[in-house]
Amino acid sequence: LNYDKCYSFELGDKKDENGTFIGRKRGERCPHCGCELIDILVIDGKDERFSFLGLDGIITASCCPNCVTFATDGISNRFTLDGKNEILEYEGMEENYYRDEEIESLVNNRFVVSEKERHVFYGAYGDDVNTIGGFASWVQDWEYRECPECGKKMKYLAQIHWDTIEDCAEGTLYIEICPECKIVTMFHQQT
């Protein structure tokens, strides 16, 4: 349920939206709360570093940053390898707690992917490391969701600690994948 390779995100001079990155506005609003929808993670599977994923294309994981923190079932997407996706139905909130400035801060982060591979447990060492692959730093208990399409357990794909991209935020966003069905699911944990 885990990948045997791991890469981290590091602070760079500026984010490069031509490859793998965290946070981009979609230009759409959440149908539940009205918050700006974001592509929280874009992975370029054509990048040799991510060949271990076995997906030769671009994977985009999108969510409402407001609703995903409250959605018990998380938010799932069906993706295509050309970087497009469809956000599947989810249970959202009525009230939006995100201000526009917070969305700007989130999408204007400077994270870039590490050039060198990290130890497979690198992401499990602390609560301030954003990773792709390897093992997660579970805030609560480990949690491998079932694919909403086929019902099999999904593989852990990535983690993003909210406070690394948004001041004073709490908790961690976990992203899991079913490569066969081309589904990603995002969910939140915090103490």
Can you describe what each PLM-predicted range is?
Residues L1-T191:
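Preference for intrinsically disordered or flexible, low-complexity segments
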